[in-house]
Amino acid sequence: MSGVRTLLEKSGYSEKAIEYYEKMLNVGEIKDPDAHFAYTGPCGDTMEMFLRIESHIITDAKFRAIGCAGSYASASALTEMIKGKTVEEAEKLDEQDILNHLGKIPAPKIHCACLAKRTLQEAIKQYKETRQ
C-alpha cells in the first residue's frame, strides 16, 4: 500500500475516491473543444474543463487542475459521469451527485465537488452562448 493511499484513507477518502485520484481519469486537454472554461475556486484550486459535444451529447470530457486530491477525484468522477449525457442532463447534476458517486471525501474537501460542478456549468454556459 502506497504512503499516499494510506494518508488518503486516514483522511477519510473512500476507496472509489482514491481510485479516481490515483488513475487520474480524463486528465488532459481536448484540441479545439466545443466548450472550455477555467475557474479558480475560493480555496485557490484552479480547474480547467474541456468538452467535446456532438448533436448536443457530451462525447468526451477532460480537465486540468492545480489542486488537491479532492479536486482531482471530483473532476475525474464528474468527467466520467457526463460522458454520453446530453448537455441538459449534465447541467442537472449537482455537487451531491458527485459526492454520492465518489462515496466519501473529507468534509473540508466537499468544496472540491462544487469547484468541479461550477467549472462544468460555466463551460456549458459558454457553449450555449456561442451556439446562439
Give the location of each predicted region.
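Domain-level signature for proteins that mediate thiol-based redox and metal-cofactor handling
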Residues: 1-132
